[in-house]
Amino acid sequence: MDAVVSCQSNSFQPTDQELAEPSIHPSIDDLIALVRAQEDRIFSHARERAIDPLTLRTQLLLHLPRLVTADDFPDERDIQREILAVSDFLEERRLKYQPEYTQSLKQPERPLSLGDLEFGPLDENTAKMYHESFHYVGSYRPGRHFAFRDKNSGRIVCLGSVASFDLGHAEEKIAPDVDPRSVLMLSRFFAFRWAPENTFSHFHRKLRLQLIEEFDTKLMFSFINPNLGFNASSHKGAHWTLFAREAGTRYMYLDGRYRTMRFFVKNYGTSDAAKLKKKLGRSFEVSTIDLHPMWLLAIPLQRRARKAIPTIPYLFQRPELCASSSAKIFLDC
């Protein structure tokens, strides 16, 4: 799920570049439309493999950009091959986490309401299963984890994790008004399709109270990836604000599998594509299709943090990262 009702002029309006005339070259928006046009086929295949349909769709949107050339999209055969490859990976996760995986996909016996939900902490092992199996990034993010459970069955309805604030470029902007030590990142939010309406807003209210009470948190950030078709509607409903756009988005792959910047820095010491290509050779690939900037959203949890929110969103350039960097960094996409 993704999600600013704000009296400021700060909004989610597209940039001049995003409003430009369509390019003759394949665009990410065209790729999103292509995947949506095949949604019935994708969802049907997911049901046959007993994997989550939405996870398969978003994983395809992460993997297909590596097959886009300067002139054209992947052909029908390539798309089908990618559907099978991503499905194989997701099926591995299903088998790894049985029976919890299959049980999580089952519709509840009766529709749930917000009153059926109970907020509380989630242990690391359980969070890892949901991060790896159902969140579009597909990898575990360490931190503090919280969930809504059905009071009657104990089933997890949604979860979200918070991690330490590690955005050096954003810290420079907020430091005059907010102590960076009082800032957290909201990461890996996920809700099942059968979750009640407005689950994110309800979850955020509970999480906000928890973080203020436990950590005296004053400001929270979260990233949204519009290249997956996310429009931040849930965040808008929960009063998040567009703090910045981060240009330079690109996807990196190892042996055909999408991997995060965090993965490459942890395992190979850098996120610099040229250095990784030299180290890893043909097994390493980078998407060439132009991707929209990532959206960095923010929400003040206490009144004093409102001054840190810009009237006009900042524009950042995505940094190259290395393991020895002493600067705070963002490694999650």
Short names for language-model regions:
Residues 310-333:
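Short, cationic low-complexity segments
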Residues 143-145, 292-297:
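Short hydrophobic/aromatic beta-strand or adjacent loop that forms the aromatic wall/cage
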Residues 2-8, 12-16, 20-52, 56-57:
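Intrinsically disordered, low-structural-confidence terminal and linker regions
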Residues 39, 43-107:
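Charged, low-complexity intrinsically disordered segments and flexible loops
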Residues 156:
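Glycine-rich acetyl-CoA-binding "A-motif" of GNAT/NAT acetyltransferases
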Residues 100-141:
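Short amphipathic alpha-helix that is part of the acyltransferase structural core
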Residues 121, 142, 150-151, 163-285, ...:
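Acyl-donor binding region in acyl/amide transferases
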Residues 159:
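Short glycine-/small-residue motifs
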